[in-house]
Amino acid sequence: ILKLKLFHLEQGAIEVIKAAYAEIGNVAMVSSFGADSVVLLRLVAQVNRHAPVLFVDTEMLFAETLEYQARVASLLGLTNVQVIKAKDAELHDPSGTLHKSDPNACCSLRKTEPLQEALSSFDGWITGRKRHQSGTRARLNMFEAEDNSPRIKVNPLALWSAQDTQRFMQDTQLPRHPLVAKGYPSIGCAPCTTPVKE
């Protein structure tokens, strides 16, 4: 029964991705290449391995994330991974310590603003967001209008549980981010990410 459920989740996600490319127009996938990003990357690669994948390099990521990004892109045959970086990081954060005094400003400078600029030429974007991740996402739809933008957000994994994601990774033998084994359930920038003690 679990394999059948996972099969239906996979096929459903693939259909959502296909519909996004067919109906929305110019669509990019956004990926952090984090703890479980490889699941959605695999599904997108199955549909179109030449599709644009936006990867925001905040220049504060773990070396392991950069290595994992290159490894996964190669493994899945992704040919259009676009590395996005902040243009003004050195100007606004010359010492690289903004995260210590104002983490929100650092995220805005290094992640949010560069991503929004990169997305400005797209009609929609594919995310890995799931309903189980927070209360505000409990009613997450597969397709949703982005706030204050004409873009459409596409959430092919909205119905997937954490267990579904893990089982899919095991069944398909997808490589895990190396920091997961070191106690990092979620992986972002090195200064702001800590392992969870069991």
For each feature predicted by the language model, list its residue ranges.
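Nucleotide-activated chemistry modules centered on ATP-dependent adenylation/adenylyltransferase
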Residues: I1-E198
